[in-house]
Regions:
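Basic, polyanion-binding surface patches
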Residues: 2-184
Length: 184
């Protein structure tokens, strides 16, 4: 069985099959998390809307895949309450937050005590092509249609075809580094 196909708890055990003939033994999860905290990453709120409802979450695991055609990916823990909503809706929007939007980041990360349904009460929200919520003050928004989802360890890697882009105000972006928000 490929490591891509294993259940999250199998991957969390620290050893799984690799493409190479020898098994892969990973570093301790706490060491890995500490090491990853040293990588600065832009902070995004990923939103979705459609027949399964609307939802969103804060993410730093977002990156470009290709510009031909424009494609990006987002990683989402499968245990997140947003995971089934996003999968059923088949669309999402990556809203890259401005440095001043830490309250929105915390709200969608579940750190504010606000119910998931009330997250959209903060900020001004619009829509582009897919109907997903677009934060008007975001530095940039990528409106995407899901083209593939791969299960890897505890997360889904969601690939999206970028159907629309909205460039926001040219402000500093919010970054997460060493377990704290910073601006770039």
């Amino acid at each position: 069985m490929s490591w891509l196909d294993q259940r999250p708890d199998d991957a969390m055990a620290g050893a799984f099959d690799a493409i190479a003939p020898e098994p892969v033994v990973t570093v301790d999860a706490a060491v890995f998390r500490d090491a990853m905290s040293r990588l600065g990453a832009a902070v995004h709120v990923i939103t979705t809307a459609g027949k399964a409802g609307h939802s969103g979450f804060t993410a730093t695991a977002v990156c470009s895949v290709s510009d031909a055609p424009p494609t990006l990916l987002v990683c989402l823990n499968r245990r997140s309450q947003t995971a089934p909503v996003l999968q059923q809706n088949g669309v999402f929007c990556v809203n890259t937050l401005a440095a001043s939007e830490t309250a929105i980041a915390d709200r969608f990360a579940g750190r504010s005590g606000v119910a998931r349904d009330d997250c959209f009460a903060l900020g001004e929200w619009t829509a582009l092509t897919t109907g997903c919520p677009v934060l008007a003050s975001s530095v940039v928004a990528f409106d995407c249609r899901t083209i593939d989802i791969k299960a890897v360890a505890s997360h889904n890697v969601i690939f999206g075809a970028v159907e629309a882009v909205r460039l926001g105000p040219p402000e500093a972006a919010l970054v997460y580094h060493n377990r704290a928000y910073k601006q770039v």
